[in-house]
């Protein structure tokens, strides 16, 4: 039954997203809400950037509906797990709301990057408030248990880092959504394996929301008014949800899932490509004494395009690289010592 309900959350999100995105396109074209091309952006023509508005409502509706259905059919969540799950998801919704509203403002009228950064820190602080923070490095660099004085700031830092990694890599069609689809598939499958049904339903609800968007983003045509971008509303909330799922999986909590060596590596493996890219770009900007949050053309997709690849070939190469990292990490986790 749990697998059926998880599948239902996926299907429901796909249907809702496929229903909502065309309506967003209609409104965007009527109100002339477009992403205008410039020297840094690689797209041609005027394209709406409000696709991300559909993400949070669709995911929350699907997750809430299926969770309510679980209780109606008598498939309740264990009391000892509810004690941890309820505050985590309530504070998650608080953080999502902050990023969702700031993303909408940024997509419509613009928002200073300092303000966005402050809101990201505020949203990231919701996780420790819920008792969710990185409390163990599983032997990475010889470190196991972490003090709250180290783990809580590290959690906030990693959350902001992941949010910006997804936001900054959203430069060509299908890249941010494609990397997120891979990450959500991996994390959702891991939660299914450990019978963490609520987290799995959340991951697959998010996955289902992205699939129709990916189609419109990659295969839509600007001249036919069927192409759309996720905008900051989408990339910020998507990064936040991925941070939540990743940190939840990496956190040691025997009430949620069993401890096993290498959990932190497996959890962060799907995000290696965007994380490495944003880390490299930030180093370049710092070395050149440029503002860290001012956009440029140093990202991995820009390098692929400068090398002569088309947008679609660049996306295929980068997504393929992300898949290779995930497979290698999972295949070698039991043979390589974290220490």
What are these regions (language model features)?
Residues 62-79, 100-111, 129-141, 250:
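Transmembrane alpha-helix boundary signature
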